[in-house]
Amino acid sequence: MDKQQDQQQEARPVLEGPDIARVLTRIAHEIVERAKGADDVVLLGIPTRGVFLARRLADKLEQITERKMPVGSLDITMYRDDLRMHPPRALARTEIPGDGIDGRLVVLVDDVLFSGRTIRAALDALNDIGRPRAVQLAVLVDRGHRELPIRADYVGKNLPTSLRETVKVQLAEEDGRDTVLLGAKPAAPGAHP
Amino acid sequence: MQRHLISAADLTRDDAVLILDTAEEMARVADRPIKKLPTLRGRTVVNLFFEDSTRTRISFEAAEKRLSADVINFTAKGSSVSKGESLKDTAQTLEAMGVDAVVIRHSASGAPYRLATSGWIDAAVVNAGDGTHQHPTQALLDAFTMRRRLVGRDAGLGKDLDGRRITLVGDILHSRVARSNVDLLHTLGAEVTLVAPPTLLPVGVETWPCEVSYDLDSTLPKSDAVMLLRVQRERMNAAFFPTEREYSRRYGLDGDRMAKMPDHAIVMHPGPMVRGMEITAEVADSDRCTVVEQVANGVSIRMAVLYLLLGGNEPAVSHARPTEEK
């Protein structure tokens, strides 16, 4: 009964466009503060939406530091631990900035932090690409329910959720508008993508 | 559900474009210091080669190892096959060992199809060349090379070869590369022309989805890519043309002929090249010749195929043609 009611319930926005811009500005300032000027920072977004967020963060960091910020993308599909539970997915783009990541402070950027498995895969992928000085994690939304000992260094919004809920991030570059929606999960339970 | 790659004709346009796009990402791995992905960790792939082919075998082996698969190489020479063991017994042995995929090269056309459909083995079957029938990964790597050179590396993503004019020259009769290429290029929207002496064209070629010509010189100016095929003397049991000299004069590509091609057009060859007969050294060493690129692209394509067939719990590649065989 409960479930049916949940499903009928409309997804409701928890963050709107201006909120997203504001939290990204805050994260940018936090990065500069913690990295003491962000001299050696490389931003790597996790496709799809993490890449857009990484680019936006890079713009904001450039405004603050007045320096060009290296930004790239890191596809983690081949490193997922659930590859064999689904049909193989089309690969997304991995693009590492020209100077590489050796000795740099890599900030991974993703839209939602959930089980932590995506970030685990990203750490493995980084391992094959180079050896960063340190790796930090920035996410727009942390919805909890971690399955691995992983936490984010920069969080846009902590959003306590139930496992019966879904968090959907929409960004202008991909979806035409900026919003974070909290809704009810349709039918079958499954892992976070 | 089928999970094999037996013929280039089995691939739909979407499948083929997915494989080419995936290969583009795989090619990036080759540029990295650590050329390895954990994707097929714990999966066992057997390279079952009943016919000699160092080039194709090491290409598959490199692809399998870059995806972290466990690789077993099997060559018929010195194995129980030379003692009289049948394909069925070999297959059942592999099945008992829990093999996940079999890459098979066989001199008999249809052997991979038999292996995939007989129920002897549960593994995915990838055809690495069977007789004069098919060599689908070769066709895919050729299409990949064409798309990269003619459309562009990044601009080509998601695109096919619509409207490109491709000419295949030489021994069409004995060439599985030609058959696979005609099938795949047609699926990808290219216009294919075959140029060969009448004796080296197979019976029924008029039913293939391509044009046929006997005159290379008139075809060159309107070609975006010219692919020369090796004259397969080992498969020839009769005289198909008078002399090598005459073949070379009419169907070989030299500098003068290459000059008739449009500026953007490329020269391709599946290898091994017979220099001086199908292709002169001048053409083979020019920067329009993609032979070395084709070899590098072969590894990326084979990684893409293995990932899409084995990476998940079911293959990502669908099959247009269910059961019937040519």
Swiss-Prot record, chain A:
UniProt KW keywords: Glycosyltransferase, Transcription, Transcription regulation, Transferase
Catalytic reaction(s) noted: UMP + diphosphate = 5-phospho-alpha-D-ribose 1-diphosphate + uracil
Residues that hold substrate according to the record: 48-49, 89, 93, 110-118, 143, 167
Keyword Signal among UniProt keywords: no
UniProt-listed Gene3D superfamilies: 3.40.50.2020
Pfam families attached to this UniProt entry: Pribosyltran
GO biological process, one term: regulation of DNA-templated transcription
Signal peptide location: none
Top enzyme class: transferase
A GO molecular-function descriptor: uracil phosphoribosyltransferase activity
UniProt superkingdom: Bacteria
TM segment ranges: none
InterPro entries, per database record: PRibTrfase_dom, PRTase-like, PyrR, PyrR_bifunctional
Residues spanned by motif PRPP-binding: 106-118
Enzyme Commission number(s) of this protein: 2.4.2.9
Entry similarity comment: Belongs to the purine/pyrimidine phosphoribosyltransferase family. PyrR subfamily.
Job of this protein: Regulates the transcription of the pyrimidine nucleotide (pyr) operon in response to exogenous pyrimidines.
Protein name (database record): Bifunctional protein PyrR
Lineage: Bacteria, Bacillati, Actinomycetota, Actinomycetes, Kitasatosporales
Gene name per UniProt: pyrR
